[in-house]
């Protein structure tokens, strides 16, 4: 947790970051960091709340106890209010600081007799800032230039002066409230609420700011502010130089070295842990900028009126003493004295009649713009000079240093970056009623000086900044020449004008001790930083007003002298407890103050001596502080490192445990995932196998159904074809029968007519031959012929009608048959298309089956190769195992033989040993018997026997020992043999297990080979089935092609028959035409015959004429040949010839008609459709 706290402190954009990280720490960490950082409670949002004071007091008991030893009660109570604006971070152990302050208190008691005579005034002043200070906090990055100004020294400021002003502004309190907010935005606000902000601004300027960068309260030389955060002075802090007691170039080198750039984020932790230097932090600009402070116009006017007489008294100064141009400061100094400091007050417009002088004085308050720390900003942007808001401007560190360090400065710099909190509270608490109106009246003068100064400062900003750099060396030289009483008088004179909020009391503390005030004195006066007013009060007036025996009298005289023309007269003693808790009597004893009245030379000497004495004591204090700070820093680092080590150890253990748990979780998850994958893949394989079986079954059933459907369709088609053929054959047979019957009837009629015609011909011949005698018979013949022709016509019409009716009936029947045949043909076409589609599908299926068969065959080959390889591997492994087994058997047999031999040898040895033992026992028994017998004989012999027995005993013991050794060796060897036997048994068991594993592997391989064989058989079966299906498809295709060829052959036959019928019809038609021509010729002959026979009666000519008219047209083509023939041939022969021709033509026509009818029957559409089908 300590490492976390340190990281958060490093990332903190402001010191208050440590407060947020502190809230989550435990008790032990709080104790450790309480030692490191002091009380780390956050500064309250509203400083007036007493809870924050109680918390601060409770969190730092040692701090409070150490203060109580040497701080007055009133001062301690007054400091409680100022704690609200105190720093949240300190650079040193507060105990060390307080111990150092005790020594300073004793020294100040010796120097200044009446040091604590007016300490009760600090009570009201200390309580002011927390109660009436504005409560609006600025964020971490929004501090104005006024707050940044005191942390930015110029490039080469005087060593002592820069340190005096800078060391106490090490910390920029970004978390504190803006004391100017709410005071400057509203011009109509009451002056009682405006004065606290103006008086609280200069507080950080005094050395009290070293204890905390917030506004502090006026303190006596022994007072030390009670802060929320303890001070931790770094080893690099030059305390003596900061307090104004050191003029060594070392401080300047430190400060200029620290100005090289902004500090990194690491410096935050350095500040919190006391490892940084105050000078480094002073070179860093604040993270925010305060706005320019401008007073109301009524206050500016009042301040301007006061400064008119003061300006007249400043004309005696030399022009070389003016830092920025020809401007003369508003506060008077002794004649002939040169001031090295800028007589800069942001409210200098109150002391001069012309606005130009006011702007110059206003511009002199911002030399920090020339500091190289912030080259990014323009000349005085960081000071807020170009802002139009009403906040105060920030004084540069050089100006603060000059105000607190130079004894010759007649005009004091207004530290406007932080409010002088104590003064606004002094008026209500300890100021008399007569002193309050002047304090309120000081505000118009401040407003007036700033109303005219911002514009002029913007116009002459560049010249002013360049002039600041040029005046630095002259300021360093002039600083040594200015030590003397005029500074004291000027400071004392300016103290009466401090209610306007422009004169820091730190300068009074510097000027009173001959240019450099002691550290306690400057700390006590840190919070009492009233602004410089515009009244030009002379040094003589200052000496008559302030150096009085009684602080009350001095305050009264000061207020009385300046009340008439100074509306912002400040009462510096107990009457103004918040504004001047450290009066002039705190700096000098009353006797010394009285001795200062006659002349300024004696005051110079006295103040110089006091400054030297305090500078020497301050150096010793600084060394002590540095050593103690370093010690506390080292202890803090050791505690921090121990905490970090413990925390890292705990973190490492937790990380190891977490890592182990993560590893276990990962392994468990991996195992579970592997199991899930195995089960999922097994399920998927099973599912695919089932799907394959289902698909194969579906395919087989689909093939069977397709075959059945095809067989049904083929059978149905064949049945339909057979039925159509039968119907066609029946129809053709019926038509043939009808035609034959009609032909028979027509033949009969024709024969009958031929017979009649023959009879008529015979009769006509007889009549012609006997024309003369048979005229009547001829007429009868003619009538018969006419009757015959009429009957023939009726017969022909009847035949034609019958032909029409039969043809219509036949056409209807034929149309129906054609429709049926067309439907059958369409069905046949659909069936053919279906057969084509089925054939294509079968071809596709056959192709797929071939591809699958090839793939399966390829896989089968691969599987066969793999199985063969596995078989070879298994066989080789089996052979090697067999060889190993043989070798092991041989080894085991050899070892068994060796074991048997060893056993036999051991048994033999045991037997020999037992035999030897038995022999020895027997020998011993014999010896004992001999011994007893010999013992009885004589003593000598007994002795010899005894010796012999002893010798035998020793031998026996030796033999027994050797036997025991041999037996032990045998037992060891037996144990070894037993161990070897157990090892052999274990190896045999391992071999058995390996054999079982091999057997299992062999079984598995056998099962795999069986599965592969079964799969190969299935594949072969599938290939056979596919080939069978392919052959069946091919057969079906061939049958379909054969049927198509048969249908095409039938169509060709029908087409040939149609062609033949068409030819027959043409012939019949030609025959009919020839018969018609013959009839016409016969009619013509009939007409010509009566013309050649004059004896014919006229009634015979009527029918003859009609017949002639009927046949006249066809016979007109050959009239010439008929006439000569009639003329040459006898008429009866010609008549017979004509009759024969006529009958021949009729017969020919009849035959042609019959032939045409047959051809039309053959050319009927149903016959064509049937044959084409």
UniProtKB/Swiss-Prot annotation:
A GO CC term assigned to this protein in UniProt: ciliary transition fiber
InterPro entries recorded: FBF1, FBF1_C
Chain positions covered by the region annotation Disordered: 17-168, 180-225, 241-566, 1091-1124
Record-level GO BP terms: apical junction assembly; cilium assembly; establishment of epithelial cell polarity
Compositionally biased region (Low complexity): 80-93, 206-216, 1110-1124
Coiled-coil positions: 617-742, 808-917, 975-1057
Location(s), subcellular: Cytoplasm, Cytoskeleton, Microtubule organizing center, Centrosome, Centriole; Cytoplasm, Cytoskeleton, Spindle pole; Cell junction
Residues in cross-link Glycyl lysine isopeptide (Lys-Gly) (interchain with G-Cter in SUMO2): 1002
Residue ranges, compositional bias (Polar residues): 331-345, 396-411, 468-477, 533-544
Composition bias type Basic and acidic residues, residue spans: 46-56, 247-258, 287-299
Pfam families (UniProt xref): FBF1
Lineage: superkingdom: Eukaryota
Keyword annotations: Cell junction, Cilium biogenesis/degradation, Coiled coil, Cytoplasm, Cytoskeleton, Isopeptide bond, Phosphoprotein, Ubl conjugation
Known tissue expression: Broadly expressed.
Modified residues (Phosphoserine): 172
Function: Keratin-binding protein required for epithelial cell polarization. Involved in apical junction complex (AJC) assembly via its interaction with PARD3. Required for ciliogenesis.
PANTHER family: FAS-BINDING FACTOR 1 (PTHR33689:SF1)
Subunit structure: Interacts with PARD3. May interact with FAS cytoplasmic domain. Interacts with TRAPPC14.
Protein's name in the database: Fas-binding factor 1
Top-level taxonomy: Eukaryota, Metazoa, Chordata, Craniata, Vertebrata
